[in-house]
Amino acid sequence: MIYRYIFWDNDGVLVDTERYYLQASREALARVNIELSNEQFAEISLAAGRSIFDIAVASGIPEQSIAELKEWRYRRYAELLEQEEIALDGAADVLKKLHGRLGMAVVTSSQKHHFEIIHRRTGFLDYFDFCLTREDYTRSKPSAEPYLLALKQCGCAAENVLVIEDSPRGLKAAKAAGLACWVIPGHHTSAQDFAEADRVLCGIREVMQLIL
């Protein structure tokens, strides 16, 4: 198959941010005496694509309190993202070498504010034709909507587009949109089921080796 376009997931594929999202989520729930385990985070957020605040709902936390917790996490996550360089090893090299050889875009569930903080220092945005963040669509992954919107925007046929993901919900979204998907499992997703993936890779550099 000849791929003319790559849709990159962001968190866990290009940048090491999921640990900060977990930390912010864990700290938020701790404010109402709820513990969040790594396993719960992986299953609820990365596999099912649901809100970790479903745990708070099930625990009987009032709706207004949950809204305040979400806002608190939003601010805390932004603070954590400012702390250090978060580009994953090999990402810059791969993007630089693929740039100009085929089209590339980012399709992420990150909110625009956080996405901009993340890439303030990476320099990655120059490599992409466009980036879709959470505000650009109604239904997030595992819905096909984000990738269908990206497909419409890039102008390529579905068979010429490749998605790079790291989570079950991202894989489901890509497949629901009729797209090929290679998965690079991360620390929080290595134990998940990726049987539907067209390839499961060990790292981002394999993308370049297989494409070029």
Task: Name the predicted role of every residue range.
Residues 35, 68, 97, 178, ...:
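Acidic/proline-rich low-complexity IDRs
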Residues 16, 43, 47, 64, ...:
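Residues at secondary-structure transition points
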Residues 2-93, 100:
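N-terminal helical cap/lid subdomain that shapes the substrate entry/recognition surface
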Residues 1-4, 102, 111-212:
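Asp-based, Mg2+/Mn2+-dependent phosphohydrolase catalytic module
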Residues 25, 53-56, 73, 108, ...:
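Generic structural signal for conserved hydrophobic packing positions in ordered secondary structure
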Residues 92-95, 171:
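Short amphipathic alpha-helical segments and helix-helix/interface helices
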